[in-house]
């Protein structure tokens, strides 16, 4: 007789989590594609700083000259823990599920399987939204505020490639400004300091409107100047709109309309906020070095009460409590988005 496998065994829950459809996220999937998991709660991050040193001339009688190694800086971070959980009660298993037929013959055990899959899907989507928010905060502020129950700190990457246009006549809302010249200047700054060519520009909604409607931009986008730039708005998934391309720079321009629910700044008045500040833009390179790191998760085995440390992106766990009877489903993750070269992108506030 075959042994029965509980749906709440870690290996079974792990397979459920792995089979769930992913949530598409623009920043995370476009830039922070490299993933690495660790067996420790702390991770070491190497930050490299290159140079444009030229090979030295030497006399044929002297021979070679030693060139110093390019240095790097290692910092240790503790990836923040995110651990949303759901509760299943007896009522959840005995009553009809949303969308279930009034005359359904499903058993409580069958409903338990469906609810577990739905719960893990919801929990993983919440974690992925958190990862996307962390990526956006890293890009636009160079820091990740860690605010939650029992935690209030900031992970700061010492980002300095940013500029706010404060002079009224130079703001993109003024006809006297020159958005194309500004973008060229910021693009060159990243080339000089970050050693990469920015190929994507992500604009907030207000910046995108000011850019597209600016007379100098529209003049440049005249049909006769097709080789310089083109505007061809096109809707893409998950709030991303392709605006056009500045061919001269090889720079694709996007508007990213995506929001998240901020229910921790003021818990009494949760607010939907944009991932991309409406008055900001970022110039980025898909060839720059970004990573998603995941610290280890430590759980307690319900069978014997011993601690166990698990390496993985998303670690499921479950336990029960009595009076009233409840089962808890938890999905834990310790993500950290890492920009290995903080000079490889530029952020501006042009309006």
Q: What is each stretch, according to the model?
A:
Residues 1-44, 338-351:
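N-terminal alpha-helical "arm" segments
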Residues 28-31, 184-188, 313-315:
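Short alpha-helical segments and helix-capping/turn motifs at coil-helix boundaries
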Residues 34-102:
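Assembly/oligomerization interface modules of large self-assembling protein complexes
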Residues 37-39, 195, 323:
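A short, structural micro-pattern
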Residues 84-158, 178, 182, 188-209, ...:
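Long, contiguous amphipathic alpha-helices that act as assembly "spine/axial" helices in icosahedral shell
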Residues 151-171:
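Structured, charged N-terminal subsegments at the starts of enzyme catalytic cores
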Residues 171-201, 206, 212-214, 218-221, ...:
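Acidic/histidine-enriched, beta-strand-rich ligand/metal-binding domains
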Residues 218-351:
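Sequence/fold signature of self-assembling virion shell proteins
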């Amino acid at each position: 007789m075959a042994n029965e496998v509980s749906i709440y065994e870690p290996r079974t829950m792990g397979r459920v989590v792995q089979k769930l459809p992913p949530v598409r996220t623009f920043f995370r999937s476009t830039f922070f594609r490299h993933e690495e998991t660790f067996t420790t709660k702390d991770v070491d991050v190497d930050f490299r700083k290159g140079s444009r040193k030229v090979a030295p001339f030497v006399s044929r009688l002297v021979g070679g000259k030693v060139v110093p190694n390019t240095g790097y800086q290692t910092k240790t971070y503790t990836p923040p823990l995110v651990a949303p959980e759901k509760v299943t009660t007896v009522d959840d298993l005995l009553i009809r599920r949303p969308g279930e037929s009034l005359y359904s013959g499903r058993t409580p055990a069958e409903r338990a399987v469906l609810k577990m899959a739905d719960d893990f899907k919801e929990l993983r989507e919440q974690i992925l939204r958190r990862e996307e928010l962390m990526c956006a905060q890293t890009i636009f502020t160079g820091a990740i505020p860690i605010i939650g129950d029992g935690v209030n700190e900031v992970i700061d990457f010492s980002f300095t490639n940013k500029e706010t246009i404060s002079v009224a006549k130079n703001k993109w809302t003024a006809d006297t400004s020159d958005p194309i010249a500004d973008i060229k200047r910021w693009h060159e700054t990243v080339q000089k300091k970050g050693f990469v060519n920015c190929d994507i520009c992500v604009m907030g909604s207000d910046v995108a409107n000011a850019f597209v409607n600016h007379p100098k931009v529209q003049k440049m986008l005249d049909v006769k100047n097709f080789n310089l730039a083109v505007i061809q708005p096109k809707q893409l998934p998950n709030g991303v709109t392709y605006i056009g391309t500045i061919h001269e720079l090889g720079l694709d321009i996007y508007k990213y309309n995506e929001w998240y629910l901020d229910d921790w700044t003021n818990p009494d008045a949760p607010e939907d906020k944009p991932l991309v500040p409406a008055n900001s833009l970022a110039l980025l390179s898909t060839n720059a070095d970004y990573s998603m790191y995941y610290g280890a998760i430590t759980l307690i085995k319900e069978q014997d009460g011993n601690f166990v440390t698990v390496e993985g992106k998303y670690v499921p766990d479950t336990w029960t409590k009595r009076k009233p009877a409840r089962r808890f489903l938890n999905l834990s993750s310790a993500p950290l988005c890492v920009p290995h070269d903080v000079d490889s992108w530029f952020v501006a506030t042009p309006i």
